[in-house]
């Protein structure tokens, strides 16, 4: 039997050594009983208090598996792991080579305790969580103290109580109301898909077999996201015109519902197949030298770091030219269609994979959770439906090589990491993930191109266009796969991918400045104006983190709007 808890730490901001100065934990089922929450003023006292609570629960109920969630285990977990290593406390943990923290586990004689990351299930802020689950409390302002205080103020206890209560409510919704069994949203979605798929008397591996390592690697050389495409013509200009913003309704679920997707073991060809079948899908390895046609949007992202460096771009950028270099590209038939339309290119076909397709693979799953989302009787049911709809496709492309981080303390007692040996993980079926994103990208770029004269910016699932009565878009406020009008701006400025500002019209007719910038804190965004939003501008207040003695220090540094070499 499993019993769930929620926890939180407040830590000092001393640049030499950090420590937990306030902690709180609570049983998830008691999320609304703040008088039962346990508060402590050191990490050691937190662990002692938690152990006593677990031991009492085990004695009373027989529950022998305890899981406590922290909302960002990478931060809070660094204090735990540092403490365990410093005190020779045996634990197991899983941190991958990308620095993503999943769990820390302690084994006791009668029960186990695992610290887990709630962000893997509820991937949004505590403040957002309070609104989603309609809680009568709101997240406050984090108290930042350089040193551990001698006296704990009541408002600080109130603050941490609220944080833990909101997190506990979110976990209660997922694990008690909606019966989650996994600890990442993607794993939960795949488990549920397999359950529904079995109902149709079909075997998962008959359609999604384990691919040969070379074939799987070929597919993964293609995988890129839907991407963000900024304007070519209006970059850096302040635009004083009406701008409309459109979002695709449930883009990835709609793509899975409305399109055939690959199945089975693909055929492999040298070069290009003599016959291209309309009901089959293809991944092409080509070598190409290319330049963007006049009046067309770029569609190519350079995935290989070496190739990207050769032509002076980042791997996330769309590019306009190969600069007379011959570049290796891995393109689906959807990507190739755009490439040939948008670029003047010299191409040599090196190798091709050909897939059979099936058109109803995900219909039962998507329609089930579409209905649940549209007819949800509770915030928990609606949130689970959204998670199920949006988390499945990516799991098909999950990494097959797992590299764990090994933690150790350096000679100053600071937590450090090194990579462990590689481990192979059984793949799901990468072609599904790559074709879902490829089809979605084809849809977005094609719609952007059809509205070329009005185009300003394409985000993962949205278009930003000059207001016009002649836009070519299939618009519906709710229908899957169609464009919903999400907002209107009276003024805007687009610098590059993930970096733009728009003065949006609110429901009451007033306007507010919406600032998008990866790495910008809310405090930095408040300083942004149309005048100072320029390449090269710097702003104080960017948050960064580093390991120091005791755990993770969050500190402020300078945010700079950087120029890039890329040509979009």
From Swiss-Prot:
Q: Name one GO molecular function term.
A: nucleotide binding
- Record-linked Gene3D superfamilies: DNA polymerase, domain 5, DNA polymerase, domain 6, Helix hairpin bin, Palm domain of DNA polymerase, Ribonuclease H-like superfamily/Ribonuclease H, TPR 1 domain of DNA polymerase
| Annotated catalysed reactions | DNA(n) + a 2'-deoxyribonucleoside 5'-triphosphate = DNA(n+1) + diphosphate
Record keywords, A-Z = DNA replication, DNA-binding, DNA-directed DNA polymerase, Exonuclease, Hydrolase, Nuclease, Nucleotidyltransferase, Transferase, Viral DNA replication
Entry keyword Endoplasmic reticulum: no
Enzyme Commission numbers on file: 2.7.7.7, 3.1.11.-
Which biological processes are named by the entry's GO terms?
A: DNA replication; viral DNA genome replication
Q: What else is known?
A: This DNA polymerase requires a protein as a primer.
What does the function comment of this entry state? Answer: Replicates the viral genomic DNA. This polymerase possesses two enzymatic activities: DNA synthesis (polymerase) and an exonucleolytic activity that degrades single-stranded DNA in the 3'- to 5'-direction for proofreading purpose.
The UniProt family comment states:
Belongs to the DNA polymerase type-B family.
What name goes with this protein? DNA polymerase
């Amino acid at each position: 039997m499993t019993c769930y808890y929620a926890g939180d730490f407040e830590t000092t901001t001393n640049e030499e050594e950090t420590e937990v100065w306030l902690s709180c934990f609570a049983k998830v089922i008691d999320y609304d009983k703040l008088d039962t929450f346990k508060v402590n003023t050191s990490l050691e006292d937190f662990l002692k208090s938690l152990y006593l609570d677990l031991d009492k629960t085990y004695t009373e109920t027989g529950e022998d598996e305890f899981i406590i969630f922290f909302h960002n285990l990478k931060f809070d977990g660094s204090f735990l792991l540092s403490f365990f290593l410093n005190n020779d406390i045996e634990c197991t943990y899983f941190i991958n080579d990308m620095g993503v923290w999943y769990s820390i586990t302690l084994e006791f004689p009668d029960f186990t305790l695992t610290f887990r990351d709630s962000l893997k299930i509820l991937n949004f802020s505590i403040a957002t969580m309070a609104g989603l689950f309609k809680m009568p409390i709101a997240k406050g302002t984090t108290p930042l103290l350089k040193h551990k205080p001698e006296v704990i103020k009541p408002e600080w206890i109130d603050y941490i109580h609220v944080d833990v209560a909101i997190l506990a409510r979110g976990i209660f919704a997922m694990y008690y109301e909606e019966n989650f069994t996994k600890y990442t949203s993607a794993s939960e979605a795949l488990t549920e898909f397999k359950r529904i798929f079995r109902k149709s008397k079909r075997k998962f591996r008959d359609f999604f077999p384990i691919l040969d390592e070379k074939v799987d690697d070929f597919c993964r050389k293609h995988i890129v996201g839907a991407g963000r495409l900024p304007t070519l013509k209006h970059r850096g200009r302040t635009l004083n015109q009406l701008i409309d913003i459109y979002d695709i309704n449930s883009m990835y679920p709609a793509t899975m519902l409305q399109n055939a997707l690959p199945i089975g073991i693909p055929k492999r060809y040298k070069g290009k197949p003599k016959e291209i079948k309309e009901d089959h899908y293809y991944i092409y390895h080509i070598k190409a030298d290319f330049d963007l046609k006049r009046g067309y949007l770029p569609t190519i992202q350079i995935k290989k770091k070496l190739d990207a460096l050769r032509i002076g771009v980042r791997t996330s950028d769309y590019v306009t030219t190969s600069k007379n270099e011959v570049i290796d590209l891995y393109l689906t038939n959807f990507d190739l269609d755009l490439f040939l339309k948008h670029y003047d290119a010299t191409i040599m076909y090196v190798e091709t994979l050909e897939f059979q397709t099936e058109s109803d693979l995900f219909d039962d799953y998507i329609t089930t959770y579409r209905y649940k989302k549209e007819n949800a009787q509770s915030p928990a049911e609606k949130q689970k439906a959204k998670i199920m709809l949006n988390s499945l496709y990516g799991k098909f492309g999950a990494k097959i090589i797992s590299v764990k981080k090994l933690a150790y303390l350096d000679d100053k007692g600071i937590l450090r990491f090194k990579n462990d040996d590689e481990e192979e993980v059984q793949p799901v079926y990468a072609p599904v993930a790559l074709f879902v994103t490829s089809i979605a990208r084809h849809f977005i770029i094609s719609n952007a191109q059809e509205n070329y004269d009005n185009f300003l910016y394409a985000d993962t699932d949205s278009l930003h266009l000059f207001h016009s009565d002649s836009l070519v878009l299939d618009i519906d406020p709710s229908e899957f796969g169609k464009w919903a009008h999400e907002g209107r701006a009276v003024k805007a400025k687009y610098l590059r991918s993930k970096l733009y500002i728009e003065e949006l019209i609110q429901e009451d007719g007033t306007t507010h400045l919406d600032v998008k910038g990866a790495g910008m804190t809310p405090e930095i965004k408040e300083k942004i104006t149309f005048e100072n939003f320029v390449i090269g501008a710097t702003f104080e207040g960017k948050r960064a983190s580093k390991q120091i003695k005791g755990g993770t220090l969050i500190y402020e540094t300078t945010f700079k709007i950087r120029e890039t070499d890329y040509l979009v």
